[in-house]
């Protein structure tokens, strides 16, 4: 993966078929960036029957070990991967990429192309736009007091000869009204 050393192991939790964890061989903090999309597709090219995804890189919405770069995947098709496109759209400069909003309870964009490099480029564009997006009426803030709140949970797969990249838009703002959404004091999990 990206011409570097990575570890591969099957999870002891076995949440689904061939549930695997892929670890960076170098201790590197987890971060969602362009290189993340490159790594996901490098893996999917090697194992086209697997999906590979990353948890979000922010506390609360990440629910993961943020201190070490890793991914999870497997030989499984989740319900979200089967969910239909609710609304198709086109992005300027990416007219060759199929894109749409997934009919799902979270905000998920699905992009499809025979060329994974186009999905990497588009994924980076969406990530940059979402990281800086604020909508006060919807209580979405890109940051407060210098703390970032917007990130993406990406999932890559190959399906019917096409590469897909699902981008779940995440925001980790919590309020006193929704204390049940706060992370445990001793854990990054909900």
What are these regions (language model features)?
Residues 11-26, 105:
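Residues forming anionic-ligand binding surfaces in small-molecule and nucleic-acid pockets
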Residues 48-64, 73-127, 131-134:
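Catalytic or ion-translocation cores adjacent to nucleophile or general acid/base/metal-coordination motifs
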Residues 27-52:
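Helical scaffold of the NTase/Pol beta-like nucleotidyltransferase catalytic core
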Residues 18-19, 24, 61-78, 168:
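Histidine-centered divalent-metal-coordination microenvironment in nucleic-acid enzymes
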Residues 129-132, 136, 147-160, 168-173:
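C-terminal functional module detector
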Residues 179-186:
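Conserved small/polar residues in nucleotide/adenosyl-binding loops
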Residues 1-3:
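Low-complexity, highly charged intrinsically disordered N-terminal segments
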Residues 50-63, 139-154:
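A short glycine-rich, hydrophobically flanked beta-strand micro-motif that places a catalytic Asp/Glu
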